[in-house]
């Protein structure tokens, strides 16, 4: 079974280096924005998706678009809605601006992932692509579509959801919403504030992928 990884905003493939599960391809956030991943998936008969952060948002989109093809879904710090509103715990525009600045700073040696020897999950991209990604995150709201999807029968495949309890980018309450959308999902809340969970719990993500019924087919 082919496993496709949908990466997060401003992130390089190195963020997945500690995960050992075999993957067919890691799609960058730019490839998500450009429709490359959608085109590839449309030509596959079946697949497993692993989506992190912005890639998790796209994984939710593709779950609704290709429900019969999708044979397993792993959501890592994923959210249907990144921004805060009256009834939703999310980021403020000011926090998003700080995230952009922090991402640029994190690319240097001071980033804790580099100092500790773990993969650095962030890589600098062009200003144009960074802005495109942020525009997507600011505008996207999949909550109503997901609620309608769940009401119509939802997914039949296994779903795993991993979320840090104190993540400052994707709030823990987001996982509760996703758990309601996918009532049979395995939801695991992780202690701490790490957003790039693939460098903290790679073995749990590996186990989730390998637990998919058709993983070895």
Label every model-predicted segment.
Residues 1-35:
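Conserved HGGG/HGGXW glycine-rich cap/lid loop of the alpha/beta-hydrolase fold
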Residues 18, 171-180:
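Short alpha-helix in the alpha/beta-hydrolase fold that links the catalytic acid
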Residues 51-55, 59:
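Gly/Ala-rich beta-loop-alpha elbow adjacent to hydrolase catalytic centers
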Residues 64-65, 70-101:
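Flexible "cap/lid" loop of the alpha/beta hydrolase fold
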Residues 101-153:
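Conserved alpha/beta-hydrolase catalytic His-Asp/Glu region
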Residues 155, 161-163, 167:
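Short beta-strand/loop motif that positions the catalytic acidic residue
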Residues 166-170, 195:
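Acidic catalytic loop of the alpha/beta-hydrolase fold
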Residues 193-206:
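Catalytic histidine-centered segment of alpha/beta-hydrolase-like enzymes
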